[in-house]
């Protein structure tokens, strides 16, 4: 990207004159690079079956090559300062010609990124209990490379003049020294499927996942005492939960239900959390907090009646609220500093969708079909975004001073906090015609 800036910014003419200027990649106002990373993966799987036992074994191989370079000295990434060797007494060291000797350890040079290689074993086990029940267990490693932006962002390593104002990507892959590695999830699951009668089945699953090497930002201090952030892996999270399923089928009628009870915890909710808190002189989080996708209850149910000529299906979704950071107005600054992220939950929400089809008689060999889709049948206004002060949408804590100080020719003060995107989409109806020939 390139930012369009005012050429008079930071001068006495800033408020009266404007001349657009586009800076190049040697400044903090642009980030331009061209890279060609390479990625390869392969998966092997084998199955063993004997009597009531089935065992699946798999192994996945992933290779990623950023195909780029990175600075060898993170404390002086662009060689903005030159450093020379000094003697113990503090005087400069000279070579045989009387010239100053550059301190190579404090200077940076381009270094090729390593190729990241990962092996992920997977194991599945199933045991049939009689004719109408199956006990199953699974274990597996799942690896995911960080997003490309975490590798290539600010590739020129331009560090701004103020602390905590700059972030750089990290192409030092597969390294234990301020490196960037794949995020690793180790998953365990055990479950039981039981046929209650020929038309009904029930399944229960217990699962637990460890998430290692979550993306984070480490703080690096340059030799000029400017602190900036660099992507690395140092955060951890885990997920544990219970899943219940009930399926019913009778002729043209079907019912499918799914309920999940889940906890998600970690020491940081997003990669920049620790970096931002440190930049704001806020203590780091020293306990597990709910992650942004933590959702205690999830319940889905589908009801349908389908024939060869017509059919209709209704699906309902219920979700308990996800976390947000409650920051009440009027609290002391010390109390606000000590508030942990994601300390409260948004309101729960539900949605009902409806789909249907009708196969019309053929016309000149063509088969027309009518399709119906209704999203959010009840036109429910689910609150997906909330105010950090009230915990609800379209609300805020406003005093008279704030109202009197508002000056605008374009909007009212209420427009500041009444954001329509906080709510779910309204009812949507689609009718379609499909012609098969």
Regions found by a protein language model. Give the residues of each.
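Transmembrane beta-barrel strands of outer-membrane/channel proteins
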Residues: 1, 57-63, 137-141, 150, ...
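Signature of Gram-negative outer-membrane beta-barrel scaffolds
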Residues: 1-130, 146, 150, 164-166, ...
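Residues that define the transmembrane beta-barrel architecture of outer-membrane proteins
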Residues: 36-40, 115-119, 184-186, 238-240, ...
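Membrane-embedded beta-barrel scaffold of Gram-negative outer-membrane proteins
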Residues: 128, 136, 140, 146, ...
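Short loop/turn motifs that connect adjacent beta-strands in outer-membrane beta-barrel proteins
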Residues: 132, 199, 252, 309, ...
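Gram-negative outer-membrane beta-barrel transporters
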Residues: 206-215, 222, 226-328
């Amino acid at each position: 990207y390139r930012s369009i800036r005012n050429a008079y910014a930071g001068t006495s003419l800033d408020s009266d004159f404007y001349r657009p200027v586009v800076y190049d990649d040697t400044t903090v106002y642009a980030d331009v690079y061209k890279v060609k990373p390479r990625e390869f993966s392969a998966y092997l799987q084998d199955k063993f079956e004997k009597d009531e036992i089935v065992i699946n074994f798999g192994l996945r191989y992933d290779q990623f090559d950023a195909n780029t370079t990175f600075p060898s000295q993170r404390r002086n990434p662009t060689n903005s300062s030159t450093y020379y060797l000094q003697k113990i007494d503090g005087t400069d060291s000279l070579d045989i010609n009387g010239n100053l000797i550059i301190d190579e350890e404090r200077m940076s040079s381009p270094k090729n990124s390593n190729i990241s290689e990962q092996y992920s074993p997977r194991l599945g086990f199933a045991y049939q209990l009689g004719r109408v029940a199956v006990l199953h267990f699974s274990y597996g490693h799942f690896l995911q490379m960080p997003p490309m932006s975490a590798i290539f962002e600010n590739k020129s390593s331009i560090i701004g003049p103020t602390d905590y104002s700059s972030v750089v990507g990290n192409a030092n892959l597969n390294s234990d020294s301020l490196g960037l590695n794949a995020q690793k999830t180790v998953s365990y699951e055990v479950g039981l499927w039981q046929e209650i009668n020929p038309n009904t089945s029930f399944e229960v699953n217990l699962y637990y996942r460890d998430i290692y090497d979550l993306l984070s930002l480490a703080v690096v201090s340059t030799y000029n005492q400017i602190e900036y952030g660099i992507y690395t892996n140092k955060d951890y999270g885990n997920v544990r939960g219970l899943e219940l399923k009930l399926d019913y089928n009778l002729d043209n009628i079907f019912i499918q239900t799914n309920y999940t009870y889940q906890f998600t915890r970690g020491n940081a909710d997003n990669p920049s959390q620790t970096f931002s808190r440190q930049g704001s002189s806020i203590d780091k989080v020293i306990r597990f907090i709910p992650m942004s996708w933590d959702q205690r209850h999830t319940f889905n149910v589908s009801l349908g009646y389908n024939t060869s000529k017509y059919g209709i299906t209704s699906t309902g979704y219920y979700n308990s609220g996800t976390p947000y950071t409650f920051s009440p107005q009027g609290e002391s600054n010390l109390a606000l500093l000590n508030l942990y992220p994601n300390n409260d939950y948004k309101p729960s929400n539900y949605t009902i969708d409806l789909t249907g089809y009708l196969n019309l008689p053929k016309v000149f060999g063509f088969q027309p079909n009518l399709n119906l889709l209704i999203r959010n049948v009840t036109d429910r206004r689910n609150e997906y975004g909330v105010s950090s002060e009230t915990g609800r949408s379209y609300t805020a804590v406003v005093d008279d001073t704030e109202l009197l100080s508002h000056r605008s020719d374009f909007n009212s003060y209420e427009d500041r906090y009444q954001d329509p995107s906080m709510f779910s989409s309204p009812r949507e109806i689609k009718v379609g015609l499909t012609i098969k020939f």
